[in-house]
């Protein structure tokens, strides 16, 4: 919920209605990101946002906005107990990999990365980079996301990128604190960093993290790695 500051204007309506108020901005935000992708000739993976589908139910979704003007939606499949209790969110059903002009990618929102089966299904579809947008309020919650993300990189012989929200929002109910450290993780083998960390942001600090990844190294790993997780399952 990277756009959570917009929810402050709905505080007086209660948490369940405030999140639906935030959902009113989702289509406009998607359009703006699509315009940015075209204008700057880049592919953009948005953070997640609340979204009301045709069934009238509320979901947590995000968008891949390609530089060619097309977009795809991804959904959070597993919602947390707090998301159910406070906001009435529902788990989605879509689990897809996406083709881009850079790589075949997958996206899992926050809690979803803690379920190994999801990334395994995407790895079977040829996923090379897994992106994990997340929002965690405590270091405990952040550690769950981070440690699981690093495990997914090893298990699936892919790169994993996590990007989280930082800072405090004292005027937004149920979203007042966030803790994160964004990073780029790799498999752990000879061609990669020994600790599986390609790049890391400063803890709990707003910043831009830039990193290159070599997809050819993944192909070599699949065939010549010292261990071969994908083949040996």
Residue ranges, per PLM feature:
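Short beta-strand scaffold segments in enzyme catalytic cores
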Residues: 47, 61-64, 96, 162, ...
